[in-house]
Amino acid sequence: MSEIIPEEYKRTVKSALNMLAYADCTANQLEKKLTAKGYSQESIEFAVNYALQRGYLNEKRYLERFIEQLANTKLYGLNRIALEIYKKGFSLALVRDNLGEFVKDIDFEENCIKLAQKNKRSDRNKLYEYLIRAGHTGAHAAKAVKIVLSQADDDEI
């Protein structure tokens, strides 16, 4: 039993699947992209639901990979990760239910130290502020600054 799908719905679904083939995105982002292409709201909702039901659009998987990428590649702290998640448009319920699980294995203190070593600055305050802007806690940033600057002092001797 196949359902009859109007032609506009087919075009919208095809466009959505093409977008998802190139890059993962949230349902919110997909809706915005399809709206920008001029599709009707009804066909956009159909396409998003189609992609969700068939597993082409999996926000939980995307959220997990996005968090891992920000923590492991950019060495962001939890606060900056939360900001980036908000900017991407993930649903609040999804984030609330899964954030703790996805970040439990990430060593933010170690990431903070790595980021401080990667971006050595001679000024203690500038380095500390840089780490805070990267989303690390004050305690982690202070410890990283202390370690990196003590290593720099040891190198000079």
What are these regions (language model features)?
Residues 1-157:
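An alpha-helical, amphipathic repeat domain used for nucleic-acid recognition
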